[in-house]
Amino acid sequence: MPKMKSKKSLAKRVIAKKNGTLKRGKAYRSHRATGKTTKQKRHLEKATIVHVTDMKRIKGLLQK
């Protein structure tokens, strides 16, 4: 049977950490940012952890 392939589009957006959690970037930052406050844009720059309810599904797509 052939090897399972990971979803490359997701693999480029998510980074696995040593403790098993996944780190991702936040949405709503790439364009149309003039209507957002400086504080909103600053907080959207920071990465966040993938929520526990999504973790199993995403790890299945990444084959990890």
Curated annotation (Swiss-Prot):
Give GO terms for biological process: translation
Report if keyword Ribosomal protein is assigned.
yes
Write out the GO cellular component annotations.
Answer: cytosolic large ribosomal subunit
Disulfide pairs here are none
Q: Where is this region: Disordered?
A: 1-43
Q: Which UniProt keywords apply?
A: Ribonucleoprotein, Ribosomal protein
What GO MF annotations does this protein's record show? structural constituent of ribosome
* Gene3D superfamilies named in the record: 4.10.410.60
The highest taxon in the source lineage is Bacteria
**Which PANTHER family does the entry link to?**
54S RIBOSOMAL PROTEIN BL35M, LARGE RIBOSOMAL SUBUNIT PROTEIN BL35M
Family statement? Belongs to the bacterial ribosomal protein bL35 family.
> What NCBIfam families is this protein classified in?
rpmI_bact (TIGR00001)
Q: What is this protein called?
A: Large ribosomal subunit protein bL35
Please tell me the species this chain comes from.
Mesoplasma florum (strain ATCC 33453 / NBRC 100688 / NCTC 11704 / L1)
Q: What is the lineage of its organism?
A: Bacteria, Bacillati, Mycoplasmatota, Mollicutes, Entomoplasmatales
